[in-house]
Amino acid sequence: MAVSRRRGPQAGAQSFFCALLLSFSQFVGSDGMGGDAAAPGAAGTQAELPHRRFEYKYSFKGPHLVQSDGTVPFWAHAGNAIPSADQIRIAPSLKSQRGSVWTKTKAAFENWEVEVTFRVTGRGRIGADGLAIWYTENQGLDGPVFGSADMWNGVGIFFDSFDNDGKKNNPAIVVVGNNGQINYDHQNDGATQALASCQRDFRNKPYPVRAKITYYQKTLTVMINNGFTPDKNDYEFCAKVENMVIPTQGHFGISAATGGLADDHDVLSFLTFQLTEPGKEPPTPEKDISEKEKEKYQEEFEHFQQELDKKKEEFQKGHPDLQGQPADDIFESIGDRELRQVFEGQNRIHLEIKQLNRQLDMILDEQRRYVSSLTEEISRRGAGTPGQPGQVSQQELDTVVRTQLEILRQVNEMKNSMRETMRLVSGVQHPGSAGVYETTQHFMDIKEHLHIVKRDIDSLAQRSMSSNEKPKCPDLPAFPSCLSTVHFVIFIVVQTVLFIGYIMYRTQQEAAAKKFF
């Protein structure tokens, strides 16, 4: 089970301003606004990332997913699950179906991360019932909770597609913990037992939906890729549970179920990583395999090598005209290389803005929790609950609530400005049909929106320092000496001039070429 930590309203407001200022300094102080936000050491304020080790015994992905006997290596499937060469259909689109797959051995990881790629497809606008990702002490091969057993000891992340309580809050992603003694509340979609949740539509997407679930330092974080783009790293924040206590050893699993309505629940991959905190020694690799297994693997390798050689000979005999011919267009031209470099620079700016937007989402979610806790406290005081010595007065609570609401409004305005900037950057990345003037106008709009974001953050900082409490934030880290503001502005101007000159040169060449036709 998990217990969420509640901090005081004053500490919450102070931590919000500190985190907001530090995130903006990281955004401005990165290498040309294009540093990889996920790379260790990309900014001075960013913590060192943990060491990741891939665990193949707790993972699967296609192709060649199943063996000749229809089983998945290191995994056990039950119910109506159907393994195939490139995916596992956990539950087919038939009524009242259940299926699940579980690891055969228990994992003993202190910190871990799983990346799951799946599809949920159906004919109707409403689907049922949903899919669940598990980490439990024992396998739940069959049961009423999305195809798995009830009263589990561990945590389940539910992708619930059917609205049982009629509140029109589905599809939703719900994190539910259990200590092995609680029955799941089906009628209310687990709302009374949810530790965290978010509303995301994961049905009938053009690309597979991806979920990244991280358990690190007793904090469970769920990130979602909605499947609108082919970008595998386009994750957004969904839910976070702090002080999450789970079994030290457990099985990973996936289950799904259908009811009166039915969807196809397909899992394309399940990748597990063991995380090691910085400074600790990474886990030692397993011992060498036995001689018998080595001989077996060597025989399989030789067999596959012979088949590959035969396929090569057959292809060469069937396509003799392709032998010895050099491939065309191997090397890119100078113009293509320059255009590619411009697009890569714009893409880095786009990714940096998305990273800042993701951080603002997490801060906004935390502030909503603070406002909710303060509202409950005010309601209890209004009902006549006697106060305790040392607690703040009603007027102070009202002031803090008003401040929090104003902060939420400011953050929403900043998010809207960031979305507009991302839209303009996306327009710049496809300038094939636009002229020089339109391209220049896009650059000016992007610059204007970035100034708006900076001004909003400065106003929030000044407002916080003008209050009576005057919260003290940590000193901002020094900007890197490798690149100053003047150099950065000169670089942007030179890049813009070169890009406009290239577009004008290309337009003149095309106009000159048209004279011959």
Curated annotation (Swiss-Prot):
Membrane topology summary: Single-pass type I membrane protein; Single-pass membrane protein
Membrane-spanning residues: 485-505
GO biological process, any: endoplasmic reticulum organization
Chain span(s) of sequence motif ER export motif: 516-517
Signal peptide (UniProt feature, chain positions): 1-30
Residues that bind Ca(2+) 2: 163, 165, 169-170, 189
Residue intervals of the L-type lectin-like domain: 52-275
Stretches the record annotates as Disordered: 276-297, 377-396
Subcellular location(s) of the protein: Endoplasmic reticulum-Golgi intermediate compartment membrane; Golgi apparatus membrane; Endoplasmic reticulum membrane
Disulfide bonds: 198-238
Residue numbers binding Ca(2+) 1: 160, 162, 164, 189
Xref: PROSITE patterns: L_LECTIN_LIKE (PS51328)
PANTHER family attached to this UniProt entry: PROTEIN ERGIC-53, VESICULAR MANNOSE-BINDING LECTIN
Function: Mannose-specific lectin. May recognize sugar residues of glycoproteins, glycolipids, or glycosylphosphatidyl inositol anchors and may be involved in the sorting or recycling of proteins, lipids, or both. The LMAN1-MCFD2 complex forms a specific cargo receptor for the ER-to-Golgi transport of selected proteins.
Name the record gives this protein: Protein ERGIC-53
Organism: Rattus norvegicus (Rat)
